[in-house]
Amino acid sequence: MAKGKFERTKPHVNVGTIGHVDHGKTTLTAAIATVLSKKFGGEAKGYDQIDNAPEEKARGITINTSHVEYETTTRHYAHVDCPGHADYVKNMITGAAQMDGAILVCSAADGPMPQTREHILLARQVGVPYIIVFLNKCDMVDDAELLELVEMEVRELLSKYEFPGDDLPIIKGSAKLALEGDQGPLGEAAILALADALDSYIPTPERAVDGAFLLPVEDVFSISGRGTVVTGRIERGIVKVGESLEIVGIRDTQVTTCTGVEMFRKLLDQGQAGDNVGVLLRGTKREDVERGQVLAKPGSIKPHKHFTGEIYVLSKDEGGRHTPFFNNYRPQFYFRTTDVTGSIELPKDKEMVMPGDNVSITVMLINPIAMEEGLRFAIREGGRTVGAGVVAKIIE
């Protein structure tokens, strides 16, 4: 069957299912795709199609992820589901599947379990902004008080990790019943209620072009008679000729002016998110700019070198280290386009980190990098990737 043309008529939102193993994440994913395709059109996907997730590589790390698409009246959703816990950890830390919001699936029969907690913590660390809860398997719980208790537990757990536990939507249902076409309140109706919650509770994400201009510097040239040209792909925002910009990271922040934007050897009056461009800078010398810095809208981003992060350490099979590392380990941190050496401080209760682990760390870089919470990085040793991480909180 030919792939249908991607119609950009509705705003696009990225979501995913998270939660403990066997609480019904994949069944729910299949149920949403099936129920919504009946109502709004689109393609239904069966449980088996979603469960055997294809392997993908993100930053050299193999991750199994299933992608499902569905529509509501107002939006188009891309939904990710992972078969195993390790896949979730890798996915969320590498940002391979950015989520504008997550659906936390929790079995009403079991209540919150260790991975429920771990996924909520990960969501907090990697900056998933919104969580909606689907209390699954409600058909297996006859006692209304027990349901209330589980709901309370889930809300408390979310509040503990700084999500608005008391206010976020919790939908009660049964993904299995919905998948079977059940017309009761726990079946298809619960899935439609979940779709409404997605539409109303998760705000439409800001498009990359609406953000504050940022371009990671890949290369720098000097063109005689014209000045210095910086090349790279615009990460977000728009740059117009005549605007003043800041060069941020590695050394002291400098102010410069954009006097030209080039793409495919053509002169433009502006460049926008996604464009590979050359930006001509006035009054900036070739040696004042280097790969690893960023060009940015003045005041929009600051250089930092001390932060906490959440990292996943590649296993030996993934080409990672064969041995653990300890406190004060000093690898390179690859941010955007360059490596910066830094030292790792482990949590007090952690003596060492084994390949295949994920852990919260504190990092001190030797040079500052233009940084924001949510920025992804790779950890490398001599050019070889040994881990992936995300900035959780900036210390200074």
Swiss-Prot record:
Chain residues that bind GTP: 19-26, 81-85, 136-139
Pfam families documented for this protein: GTP_EFTU (PF00009), GTP_EFTU_D2 (PF03144), GTP_EFTU_D3 (PF03143)
Keywords, comma-separated and alphabetical: Cytoplasm, Elongation factor, GTP-binding, Hydrolase, Magnesium, Metal-binding, Nucleotide-binding, Protein biosynthesis
Binding locations of Mg(2+): 26
Recorded coiled-coil stretches: none
Region (G3): 81-84
Broad class of the protein's primary localization: cytoplasm
Region (G2) residue spans: 60-64
Keyword Disulfide bond: no
Cellular compartments annotated: Cytoplasm
CDD domains in UniProt: EF_Tu, EFTU_II, EFTU_III
InterPro entries reported in the protein's UniProt record: EF-Tu_GTP-bd, EF-Tu_GTPase, EFTu-like_2, EFTU_2, G_TR_CS, P-loop_NTPase, Small_GTP-bd, T_Tr_GTP-bd_dom
Cellular component, GO, one term: cytosol
Domain tr-type G positions: 10-206
Subunit description: Monomer.
Family: Belongs to the TRAFAC class translation factor GTPase superfamily. Classic translation factor GTPase family. EF-Tu/EF-1A subfamily.
Role description: GTP hydrolase that promotes the GTP-dependent binding of aminoacyl-tRNA to the A-site of ribosomes during protein biosynthesis.
Protein name: Elongation factor Tu
Provenance organism: Herminiimonas arsenicoxydans
Upper classification of the organism: Bacteria, Pseudomonadati, Pseudomonadota, Betaproteobacteria, Burkholderiales
